[in-house]
Regions:
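Patatin-like phospholipase
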Residues: 1-47, 55-389
Length: 389
């Protein structure tokens, strides 16, 4: 018993934070959830924006980190005027070989306390890349000279060619994502027993071998679009921070669902899948946590508001063949698949009407239809099951 307790005490948990520019706010939401879950972080590693967040995690102050992210906007990160247009940004890249990051350096000097990072007791590492010799630099605190932490974080986050390379002692560095955008390997090398990897699907090289080798890893990755990496916007920052929080709680089984967050045990496994699809297709708020009554009320409200489209519903309910479904999918702006949210809802309603009318004989119950439009079929089945249409 004593040996088991000692083993548990010595267990090391690593938080690995991927690169992805403005998407990094998602990682702060994950960290908030981990703190609420009481999961102690012993090691932290990051690339690019993940390196910035890793330094903040090492300092241990979530409120301070939130303050940093409130200040991160496109013009406070890059050397751009507040009223700059996208064409101005392109001009910066062409003329100056990337946008300057002077404002970001100033913010990091303000928020990153190197002394606290070094005294945190956490194993800490970041990744940078030097194009001159194609050098991949996996840097621990011992590798970073005193007083140079912010500089090496800047080096890790210099996403060339969008951003200018960052020079330290005559050596030019560019974004660590060129070496490893999600440095799980560093955590493994340093003896992590459990790895929590936060994947922003950012630009860079994913070392698949390390991802496959990691035996005890919680891989947290959003199914949502987290936004364009080089546009920092306060509203999107708050949105994806909440998504990170919810996705972490889902990863640890506190919440359920993929697109929508449900309180645990609200639906059985099969119904949960259908409800998740229904919530996504009907476009309900995915930043809330739903109990069954609240979810049903919201779904009902959406359907009621959409009933003005009855004529289109009647037409969709009349789809008689897979050929007609494909023609609908290929029509106009939908030729690459269903991307128009309103059209997606309409097809869902039409499918529900057809399933309600024809049961197992419905074209939407066929094996091919469930492969072609699985999300819509599941959503439609949910509406029929709960007699919502």
């Amino acid at each position: 018993m004593e040996l088991k307790e000692r083993s548990m005490k010595n267990k090391k948990t690593a938080l690995v934070l991927g690169g992805g520019g403005s998407r990094g706010a998602y990682e702060i939401g994950v960290w908030q959830a981990l703190k609420e879950l009481g999961i102690k972080i012993d090691m932290v590693y990051g690339t690019s924006v993940g390196a910035i967040n890793a330094a903040m995690v090492a300092q241990g102050n979530l409120d301070l980190t939130a303050e940093l992210w409130k200040e991160l906007e496109t013009d406070t990160v890059f050397d751009m005027a507040p009223d700059s247009k996208p064409t101005d940004y392109v001009k910066e890249i062409v003329v100056n070989q990337g946008a300057g990051t002077g404002p970001l350096h100033g913010l990091l000097e303000k928020y990153v306390d190197e002394k606290k990072v070094r005294e945190s007791g956490l194993d800490f590492g970041i990744v940078a890349f030097s194009p001159a010799d194609l050098g991949k630099h996996f840097l621990r605190l011992a590798d970073i000279p005193e007083g140079k932490l912010v500089d090496f974080i800047m080096a890790s986050a210099s996403a060339f060619p969008a951003l200018q390379a960052y020079e330290i002692n005559g050596v030019s560095y560019i974004d660590g994502g060129y070496a490893d955008v999600l440095p799980v390997g560093m955590a493994m090398e340093d003896g992590a027993d459990e790895i929590i990897a936060v994947d922003l699907a950012g630009f860079g090289n994913v070392v698949k071998e390390n991802m496959e080798k990691a035996e005890n890893m919680v891989h947290i990755k959003s199914s949502e679009n987290l936004g364009f990496e080089f546009i920092f916007d306060k509203q999107n920052t708050l949105r994806i921070m909440k998504l990170g929080y919810l996705d972490c709680l889902k990863a640890y089984g506190v919440l359920e669902g993929k697109e929508i967050a449900f309180a645990k045990g609200v639906f059985d496994k099969n119904t949960l899948k259908m409800a998740d699809c229904a919530g996504d297709v009907l476009g309900i708020d995915n930043l809330l946590i739903y109990t069954e009554p609240v979810f049903m009320d919201r779904i009902t409200e959406v359907i009621y508001d959409d009933m003005e489209s009855q004529e289109k519903l009647a037409k969709l309910a009349g789809l008689k063949s897979l050929k007609e479904i494909r023609e609908f999918l290929d029509n106009g702006k939908l030729k690459e698949g269903i991307k128009d949210a309103k059209a997606e809802k309409l097809l869902c309603y039409g499918a529900a009407e057809d399933i309600k009318k024809n049961g197992k004989r419905s074209i939407f119950q066929s094996r091919t239809a469930t492969k072609l439009i699985p999300k819509i079929v599941n959503a439609a089945k949910f509406l029929v099951k709960y007699e919502l249409i």
